[in-house]
Amino acid sequence: MMKPFFKTKLFGFAMSVLVLSCLVFGSGAKAWASPGGSNQLGFSAEVEGMDDLNTPGATGTMFYGGGVSIQYWISPGFGVRLGADYFNNSKSTGPLPQNILPFYSGLMVNLLSGSLGSLDLVGDFGQVLNNGVDNTYFDAGLQLNTLLSDRRQFFLDVRFREDGVGTMATPWEFVTAGLGISFF
């Protein structure tokens, strides 16, 4: 007989696979190889991993989580976005907070675009909650997009993040990598 814990985990996994399958294989109206388009609204969701770069005593500390953003492409080469991420610490003790929750707004610039995908430069500023304590936030990175299906894109992004810019003597620095899906 299965224990309730395993039933819950199995049910959660099955529902995740079902939802992702519907998102990926559902039908849309148009295909976009690049997210850039005039007056184009989009939504994205991703899973992310984050590694600390500069905090003494935090060697081997990884954060994991995900995020969502709403983006609006003003022209084919320039867009703005609003987003929020959530990261949970892999260790229960150490100098870094147990959870990090950045809220940000930023710019997206399309660097390269082709029939199969595009490369965007992204940069964001905002506020972050570290265990509920407010601080400043900055990130910059690259996002590689490829066509997934009609009006959907798969993307990989890599970002450099700073937590505590201008408020801490040495801001926490992280590098993150994420995989996600954008809808237009």
Feature-to-residue mapping (PLM):
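Gram-negative (and chloroplast) outer-membrane scaffold detector with strong preference
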Residues: 67-154, 182-184
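Generic short beta-strand segments
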Residues: 47-51, 85-88, 126, 159-161
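Low-complexity, intrinsically disordered Gly/Pro/Thr-rich segments
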Residues: 155-166
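Ser/Thr- (and often Asn-) enriched beta-sheet segments in non-cytosolic proteins
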Residues: 42-44, 136, 160
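Cleavable N-terminal export/targeting peptides
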Residues: 1-38, 184
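Short glycine/proline- and aromatic-enriched beta-strand/turn motifs that initiate or cap beta-hairpins
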Residues: 26-74, 80, 86, 174-184
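Transmembrane beta-barrel outer-membrane domains
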Residues: 36-38, 57-63, 96-102, 131-137, ...
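Generic detector of low-complexity/intrinsically disordered segments
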Residues: 12, 17-27, 55, 64, ...
